[in-house]
Amino acid sequence: MKKNTFIYVLLILFSSFYSCKENTSDDSEKLAALLLLTQTQQQTPEVSPCKDRFAIDQVGIYNAKEIISASAHTGTGFQDSHCAVDGVLGLGNFNGSLDVFTLDTSGSGASLILGWNGKKVQNTAGTDFIVFENPFQQGGNPNSVFLEPVIVEVGNDQTNWCGWNPVYNGGGAFSTDPANWLRFAGLRYVDYNQITNPMNSVSLFNMGGGDGFDLGDANFGNSGTGCSAALRADFQNNGFLYVKLTSAKVILPALPIPGANENPDIDGVIAKQVN
């Protein structure tokens, strides 16, 4: 395990890289490698980068601020689950946010369950909630993204879950094209930043990035442990309490996801309406 000073140097390098490359796509593959290296090494830093931040709600923007289950949590660095509920801090097309909670590649730590403090996310017109991870474009090509696929499910009791029947169409090799990952999260880069690029609800749900999910989608309820037609109807009519985010390969082990893309980094989840 590396010294904390090494981690701080890496973070400084990240900051410098962002400053120089903010509006370009050159060397994005190097950024992917540096992001992975930093997250791999930053296991026990003394200070969490997220501990003093909090999510900002407004009409039509309701952050999941309740941590129900986060087995990968250690309280430090990218293993601080507070980073998943302290507000979304996206960095645009070419940069992955460091304000994230990294999931494990196996076991209970490969999942994160969040809630809205007893309120239910409602079925509205269009997208009902957005999952924000930290993907970014590689080589200036929107069809080549550093992505870490996430399977999204919702529930009321932490036992029975309904999902969106995610499907991979990329064949036997790992694809960096988001179009090959249907109904997964962790695909779309994030423009919304509650501090540097705030938006109202309409803008956020149309152009803020992240991956949106709709309870009215025809695929909703076609996957998930314990999901039934009755449970799906209940979610659609009355809403849900919890959202569960899981590293895709844990649920679908046949997916050709390499090690560098196995453990997603969660920036947050935002709902359009809660009650």
Feature locations, PLM:
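Sec-dependent signal peptide recognition
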Residues: K2-L11
